[in-house]
Regions:
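Short glycine/proline- and aromatic-enriched beta-strand/turn motifs that initiate or cap beta-hairpins
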Residues: 11-72, 79-82
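Extracellular loop and loop/strand-boundary signature of outer-membrane beta-barrel proteins
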Residues: 45-51, 91-102, 149-156, 203-208, ...
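Transmembrane beta-strands of outer-membrane beta-barrel proteins
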Residues: 33-37, 70-74, 109, 125-129, ...
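Residues that define the transmembrane beta-barrel architecture of outer-membrane proteins
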Residues: 29-33, 53-59, 68, 103-109, ...
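Outer-membrane beta-barrel "beta-signal"
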Residues: 224-225, 240-252
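Outer-membrane beta-barrel transmembrane domain signature
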Residues: 64, 69, 117-123, 130-230, ...
Length: 252
C-alpha cells in the first residue's frame, strides 16, 4: 500500500463500488481498453432513527475504455457485510446469542464515467459519476429469549445501492506519478427486514429503509505507473468513517 500520508479524509462508504481513481483516465492517451483488479475496506454510518455502522470488504475486476479526457468503466465483484450491534438487545427482558450481523460474499456491479480537463502540464481537474448495486441480499440470524421464551429471527439486507459524484484536482509529479484529491457527494440506501418483530432488538418494527448518515466526503489518492502498462492506485475516502482501497490496472 502507498504510504498513507497522501490519504486525507475521504468518504466512509462512498467507495461502495471500489476506488474513484485519478481524474485522468488510466487508458492510454490515444484511446483504448484497460482492465484491473481491486480491493477495498469500506466503513460508514447509516441511520433511520438510530445510527448503524456498516463494514464491507470487497474484491472486484474492472474493464473500461477511455482517451485522454474521458473514460467509462464497469466492475463486477463480491463483498461481505457486517452491521455492528444489529442483534444487540436494548431491553433487559430480551437477550440475543450474538450482537453483529455478518454475511459473506455477495455479487455487486458498478458503472462509472469520468471527464478530465488539463490546466497545464502539471495540474488538471476532473469529475466523475459512479453507481453500484448489490444483486443479492445479505442475511444472518440469531436466537435468544424474550421474557423467558425462546425465539429465533433473521435479518435480510435488501436492494443495497449507492451513487457518487465528485470533483478531483490532479497533480502530475516526476516519473508520471499522479496525486489527486477532492470532495464528493454520496447517496446510499438499503432495506432491512426482520423475519420476526422481536421487542428489544434494534430492527424490530418491520421492514425499514436506512440511508447513509452524511452526504458529503473527501477522497485522496496516488496513481503510480509500473512497467509495461501497469498502474498501482491507492486511495482513501472519509465522511463519517474512513475507507481505503488499492487496485492494479493494465492499459492495452
Amino acid at each position: 500500500m502507498i504510504p498513507a500520508v497522501i490519504l486525507f479524509a475521504g468518504n466512509g462508504t462512498a467507495a461502495a463500488g471500489g476506488l474513484f481513481g485519478p481524474p485522468q483516465p488510466v487508458s492510454k492517451e490515444a484511446g483504448g481498453l484497460h482492465t484491473g483488479i481491486g480491493y477495498g475496506y469500506l466503513e460508514d454510518q447509516y441511520r433511520n432513527d438510530t445510527d448503524h455502522t456498516i463494514r464491507k470488504n470487497q474484491v472486484y475486476s474492472e474493464v473500461g475504455y477511455g482517451v485522454d479526457h474521458w473514460g467509462v468503466y464497469g466492475r463486477i465483484g463480491v463483498s461481505d457485510l457486517k452491521i455492528l450491534d444489529a442483534f444487540r438487545s436494548t431491553q433487559a427482558s430480551t437477550s440475543s446469542s450474538k450482537n453483529d450481523l455478518k454475511d459473506d460474499w455477495k455479487f455487486f456491479g458498478t458503472l462509472g464515467g469520468q471527464g478530465f480537463y488539463p490546466l497545464n502540464r502539471t495540474f488538471g481537474i476532473g469529475a466523475f459519476l459512479q453507481g453500484s448495486y448489490y444483486f443479492q441480499d445479505f442475511t444472518d440470524g440469531t436466537s435468544g429469549t424474550n421474557n423467558g421464551a425462546r425465539f429465533t429471527t433473521e435479518l435480510k439486507v435488501k436492494n443495497l445501492w449507492d451513487v457518487n459524484f465528485g470533483i478531483g484536482i490532479q497533480a502530475t509529479v516526476p516519473n508520471e506519478i499522479k496525486l489527486y484529491v477532492g470532495p464528493y457527494l454520496y447517496c446510499s440506501r438499503t432495506r432491512i427486514a426482520p423475519s420476526v418483530n422481536m421487542p428489544g432488538l434494534p430492527f424490530s418494527s418491520g421492514e425499514i429503509t436506512i440511508h447513509n448518515k452524511t452526504n458529503i466526503g473527501g477522497f485522496s489518492g496516488i496513481d503510480v505507473p509500473l512497467a509495461r502498462g501497469f498502474h498501482l492506485v491507492a486511495e482513501g475516502q472519509y465522511s463519517e468513517r474512513f475507507s481505503v482501497g488499492t487496485a492494479v490496472t493494465y492499459s492495452y
